[in-house]
Curated annotation (Swiss-Prot):
It is found in: Cell inner membrane. This is Ion-translocating oxidoreductase complex subunit E. Its EC number is 7.-.-.-. The keyword Transport applies. GO terms for biological process: electron transport chain. Belongs to the NqrDE/RnfAE family. It comes from Pseudomonas paraeruginosa (strain DSM 24068 / PA7) (Pseudomonas aeruginosa (strain PA7)). It is an enzyme of class 7 (translocase). Its main location: membrane. Part of a membrane-bound complex that couples electron transfer with translocation of ions across the membrane. PANTHER family: ELECTRON TRANSPORT COMPLEX PROTEIN RNFE, ION-TRANSLOCATING OXIDOREDUCTASE COMPLEX SUBUNIT E. Coiled coil: none annotated.
């Protein structure tokens, strides 16, 4: 794998083609489980593991699977890996598994995972496919984590609450009370609040992309960094 190729994969997975902010895939778990940091992190890590393993597995068997049964075979691979993650969560983080509920088995139908298996893993080697799964999964998990953190902060005035559900009793002290006497903001932890927060994150990303594009054009000398507006007289003559 060339360094340039790895950079392109990383840039696409984390920012340029982020599954949550650009492709808008996996919105059901993205909005349904991001009401707290621990829920978002738990689902993000589970999705990341399935994505990396499924990309690697699909890349390994791509030559042995015919076109006629390719998609069903990919779904079976993803379902088997999701079941493994589900059993691990039942064994080690059972309370968090109960909270996340149906969203863990629904990883099987997550369009992010099936999309990367079909579009990338089935056409590339194991290392490239695994790296793509890692960076795409990280991009999805980071959006989940930011969304969960913002919603928890606005909804409850805390950060990292109940992290012991994922990391054990030692994480009980990780909770940060940002606003000591905060009464809470119910909308932030409800589904409408998730839609609003996600929309704001998408708008912020688009604004950053526009600023970077303008700066790049200015440095290339195509357009001035801050073009002056032309004023038009009532006669129609431009000053």
């Amino acid at each position: 794998m060339s360094e340039q190729g790895l950079r392109e994969i990383a840039r696409d997975g984390l920012w340029r083609n982020n599954p949550g902010l650009v492709q808008l895939l996996g919105l059901c778990p993205l909005l349904g489980t991001s009401n707290s940091t621990v829920n978002a992190l738990g689902l993000g890590l589970a999705t990341l593991l399935v994505l990396v393993c499924s990309n690697a597995a699909v890349s390994l068997v791509r030559g042995a699977v015919s076109e006629a049964i390719r998609l069903p075979a990919f779904v079976m691979i993803i379902a088997a890996l999701t079941t493994c993650i589900e059993l691990l969560m039942q064994a080690w983080t059972y309370e968090l598994y109960q909270i996340l509920g149906i969203f863990i088995p629904l990883i099987t139908t997550n369009c992010v995972i099936l999309g990367r298996a079909e579009a990338f893993a089935a056409k590339n080697g194991v290392l490239r496919a695994s790296f793509d799964g890692l960076l795409t999964g990280l991009g999805f998990a980071l959006v989940l984590l930011v969304l969960g953190g913002l919603r928890e902060l606005l909804g409850q005035g805390t950060l990292l609450a109940d992290m012991q559900l994922l990391f054990g009793p030692a994480a009980e002290t990780w909770k940060i009370q940002i606003f000591p006497h905060y009464q809470g903001f119910l909308l932030a932890i409800l589904p409408p609040g998730a839609f609003i927060m996600l929309g704001l994150l998408i708008a912020l990303k688009n604004r950053i992309d526009e600023s970077l594009a303008e700066r790049a054009r200015a440095q290339a000398g195509d357009v001035p960094a801050s073009p002056q507006r032309q004023r038009v007289r009532v006669t129609g003559v431009i000053e």
